[in-house]
A protein has these predicted regions:
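Flexible, glycine-/basic-rich loop-and-beta segments that form/coincide
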Residues: 426-534
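Conserved catalytic motifs of ABC-family nucleotide-binding domains
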Residues: 312-315, 319-357
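Hydrophobic alpha-helix feature that most strongly marks membrane-spanning transmembrane helices
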Residues: 246, 278, 282, 311, ...
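Feature representing long, continuous alpha-helical segments
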Residues: 239, 271, 308-310, 361-365, ...
């Protein structure tokens, strides 16, 4: 393609905004007029040659066929495109008929827009073009804008023509028009940095992604292929992918059909994308409007290639109702089959949804659900998706994010991740990564993941574009691709100051990213003693303790008088508000309800009764104390529920490392059950205390102890290691009483570039720092 011609077109169109719109729109709004007008003019030029044929078809259907509604298909056939216009107008005839009367032009313009087929009318509506035209007519610039777009000095038609001076203007192909339109979008996005990152990925990042996706299959690219972007924005990923294939890997001796698919939620960017498809001759019906997460528009389709830069750090809370019912995932795209530590797979599937504040990994799972199975020698599917750092490590073992990473790695889909330089994007300076997925890895990559750190590979821009202050040069992309394609490990290089430079690459086994998360328990040791001070807080309900304590201190026993608290309700709620105690209506009602206070006092009365029976002696053996309480309850007429009994016991007991262990229960195991337990834990009977089973001296009899929640800890054990061996090496030497809670084990997965690529930079010697200070003082 001759980009010099295209760049001249871009410059001319860009100048229209400054010439005609400067005093009518603020600079950031120029795009609202220029982009839809470019689309309109291109469609207009495409339809001009078939105008009479379309009007004749309209006449035929209305007069000969007596059609009440026009039939789309013959009109499309008459126009030669998937769109048409049944009005008598073109932009040139609109201009010719208008003279200087803006109102006549506005009226005719609306008639012209209403004559388009529904697919173009949808674009007009999404662009809000009628409103812009009305505004320009009011400001007396509509005629000027139309005149600029039909100027003989630019050629937006698919035929060669001459300008006003007789110079030849080359034809503008669909591919060339796509380039012009994309370049305009890029320039507007760079001008409007506030919104740029929402739907615009820097050109060189897309170029790297297309190389990563298509280069490994350059000799296997099918003649018919599908490309999908679930967050397509203005369509840059899709059209750049198409351009890349057509320019770099054209089909030899055959034609190649590339079908582009996408979905976009923003009206304007959807209109831009759909326009771009129409301009380039792609099927605009393949671009859908709406939320990718809420509705699975392409549920029955599978795609060859997928590229995307989904929004990161953006909440999906408003879409949860379409994905989950309570805690249950109802959308199959976001469920995965994973085995637990014992090898059991939940038939319902495991949750693969991230925290509601960041939905980026949902877009990745949407693409994974659209991968083609590599059967009968087919290529399968390849995905390139841009994400921020939280996608690599956020989320605990067993959580949605971790499950997603684990699923991709266990199923050997993750081929590589490339870390990009900071400040490469227009609206964020954070670190970003390209995830490369492949469900048909070549043999030498199977079971492996390549991590490439290209964060130090960039050249500085002379002028910042929003947050963007650097870019990839062609040689940087070539270096990344060479490292990736050759599947090489590359050591990090340091400059003379010890700072990292260049590129680094490491290759890992899939298991290197997995870990077991296991809970380590320690026994609860408690002392207990009844006292008036300890049971006094039982007067107050835990959920309202602070407010109730204030009321009791202020009014004493009057709080139990019927209606008293209600009379003083305003002063009580005012105090709560002043002291930042938030009360909803239900809590307020409880707080001022005498019956609620009386009910709470019954627990205190029960504790006082037990104190009289058990006494106020201190117990260093909680087991003995509990037996005494149970005996007292049995001997008395007190009827306490389990929560009420526990509330009293917890109020008068506390952890003390010198006290006896609190027994949970005594377990009796038959020989068969004991053998099953030993097989389950892969240990000897003598090792059972390390799993919480302590022998009692009788064959098959073990005691288990209550664990202390305050002393409970968790350990992350690499997937390649034995949990028990890790416990023996790293935990037991320091905490002799600890045991493993094997029922708690969850499998997690995380990827840490910092851990793998960090190079320690030694501190400078004091002498060197001192000398530098002396030198600076001399200069001053």
């Amino acid at each position: 393609m001759d980009h010099s011609v295209h760049n001249k077109l871009v410059s001319f169109i860009w100048s229209i905004a400054d010439d005609c719109l400067r005093d009518v729109y603020v600079r950031g709004k120029y795009r609202d007029v220029i982009l839809p007008m470019v689309v309109l003019r291109r469609l207009d030029t495409l339809l001009e040659p078939s105008k009479e044929a379309v009007l004749e078809e309209v006449r035929f259907q209305q007069e000969e066929m007596n059609a009440v509604e026009l039939d789309d298909e013959p009109l499309k056939a008459a126009s030669g495109y998937v769109f048409y216009n049944i009005s008598k107008w073109t932009l040139k005839t609109l201009h010719a008929a208008a003279t200087n009367n803006q109102q006549i032009l506005l009226q005719n313009f609306n008639e012209y827009l209403n004559g388009f087929s529904d697919n173009v009318k949808e674009i007009v509506g999404r662009f809000n073009l009628k409103s812009q035209i009305r505004h320009m007519a009011e400001k007396q610039v509509l005629l000027d804008v139309v005149e600029k777009f039909i100027s003989p000095n630019i050629n937006l038609t698919p035929q060669e023509c001459e300008d006003a001076s007789g110079n030849k203007l080359p034809a503008l192909t669909n591919l060339g028009m796509g380039y012009v339109f994309e370049e305009l979008i890029r320039k507007f996005n760079e001008e409007n940095n506030e919104e740029a990152g929402e739907h615009f990925t820097p050109r060189e990042v897309i170029e790297l992604m297309t190389h990563l996706v298509f280069d490994p299959l350059k000799d296997q690219l099918p003649l018919t292929m599908t490309i999908y972007d679930p967050a397509c924005g203005s369509g840059g990923m899709l059209t750049e992918s198409q351009n890349f294939i057509e320019e770099k890997y054209p089909a030899v001796g055959a034609s190649r059909d590339i079908h582009l698919y996408g979905k976009e939620i923003n009206d304007e960017t959807y209109a831009i994308c759909k326009s771009d498809m129409m301009i380039k001759g792609n099927d605009p019906a393949n671009i859908k409007i709406g939320s990718t997460l809420s509705t699975d528009e392409f549920s029955n389709m599978r795609f060859d290639f997928m590229l995307s830069n989904p929004p990161y750090g953006k909440s999906w809370a408003s879409e949860q109702k379409n994905i989950k019912e309570g805690t249950e995932v109802i959308d199959p795209r976001f469920k995965v089959q994973l085995a637990d530590y014992w090898g059991k797979v939940d038939a319902k599937g495991s949750d693969a949804t991230p925290r509601s504040s960041d939905g980026q990994l949902l877009f990745l799972m949407e693409m994974v659900s659209k991968m083609k199975a590599p059967v009968n020698g087919t290529i399968g599917s390849r995905i390139a998706s841009v994400h921020n750092g939280s996608s690599l490590f956020t989320g605990d073992a067993g959580g949605g994010e971790s499950n997603i990473r684990r699923y991709l790695i266990e199923n050997d889909m993750l081929e590589a991740i490339v870390q990009l330089p900071n400040n490469l994007f227009y609206n964020t300076g954070i670190t970003t990564y390209i995830w490369l997925l492949n469900n048909n890895k070549p043999e030498h990559r199977q079971g492996k993941v390549q991590l490439i750190d290209a964060s130090q590979l960039f050249r500085k821009l002379r002028k910042n574009l929003g947050n963007k202050n650097c870019e990839f040069a062609p040689e940087h992309i070539a270096e990344i691709m060479q490292t990736y394609l050759e599947f090489n490990e590359v050591e990090r290089q340091l400059d003379a100051n010890g700072d990292a430079i260049g590129l680094a690459s490491k290759i890992f086994n899939n298991e290197d990213f997995g870990y077991f998360k296991v809970t380590v328990e320690r026994p609860d040791r408690r002392k207990a003693q009844f006292s008036a001070e300890r049971i006094e807080p039982l007067r107050f309900d835990k959920s309202l303790s602070e407010a109730m304590e204030y009321c009791y201190n202020e009014y004493q026993e009057k709080v139990y008088q019927a209606g008293f608290l209600a009379e003083h309700g305003k002063s009580i709620t005012d105090w709560c508000e002043k002291n930042d105690i938030s009360l909803n209506n239900k809590a307020k009602e409880k707080l001022l309800d005498t019956a609620f206070w009386v009910s709470a006092r019954k627990l205190l009365d029960a504790a006082q009764t037990l104190m009289q029976v058990v006494g106020e002696a201190e117990f260093t053996d909680f087991n003995l104390f509990k037996d005494k309480v149970d005996a007292a309850l049995k001997a008395s007429s007190l009827k306490l529920s389990a929560p009420e009994k526990n509330a009293i016991i917890n109020a008068v007991s506390w952890y003390d490392e010198t006290a006896e262990k609190v027994v949970k229960k005594v377990v009796k195991l038959s020989a068969d059950k004991l053998a099953e337990l030993l097989e389950l834990y892969s240990c000897e009977e003598a090792d059972l205390p390390d799993f919480g089973y302590y022998p009692q001296g009788k064959k098959g009899e073990f005691v288990t102890y209550e664990s202390s929640s305050d002393l409970r800890d968790t350990e992350s054990v690499p997937l390649k290691q034995s949990i028990y061996q890790y416990f023996l090496d790293e935990v037991k030497p320091h905490v002799a009483e600890a045991w493993l809670n094997m029922e708690s084990v969850k499998i997690g997965c995380e990827i840490s570039f910092n851990k793998y690529f960090y190079r320690h930079k030694p501190l400078r010697k004091l002498e060197a720092v001192a000398q530098e200070i002396i030198d600076l003082e001399k200069q001053a």
